[in-house]
């Protein structure tokens, strides 16, 4: 499959991670590490297990609208949690952001994406109809994922930390 995508599944061991061939073709080894660690986070935090419990409620007509909203809310948080674990494990916010961008917009567009493009994404994400659309999505908008990586990098990549000095003898 030429699309860049990956997913984890399994209710019990053995769990599985699927990488589409597009991911293997277009991502570097380090970018693949980000994607694999992200998917491992879904396994570690049992996100696939939660899906098994949510799905029966989504089939009940009266509950399905509210259930879809709750499910989308939970899935978006699960994606941010998996992104955060990839950041914490790999310790490189730029690598994590670059990987997410490449998977979301494709390898060619990712190379030319700059701050102006990111500002445009932020602007369009904040429009009322996009806010509404986001409430039923199972993945956060890319700009939200990138801003969360920026937020958490301060925890993972402390800047200007004074070096510990050994006490004088």
Could you say what each language-model-derived stretch is?
Residues 33, 75-96:
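An active-site-proximal "capping" alpha-helix that borders the catalytic cofactor pocket
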Residues 1-16, 66-67, 87-169:
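Active-site-proximal gating segments in proteases and membrane effectors
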Residues 52-69:
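Hydrophobic, aromatic-rich membrane-embedded alpha-helical segments
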Residues 40-56:
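Catalytic Zn2+-binding segment of zinc metalloproteases
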Residues 21, 71, 134:
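Generic anion/oxyanion-binding catalytic loop in active/binding sites
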Residues 1-36, 40, 44-45:
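Peri-catalytic and regulatory segments of divalent metal-dependent proteins
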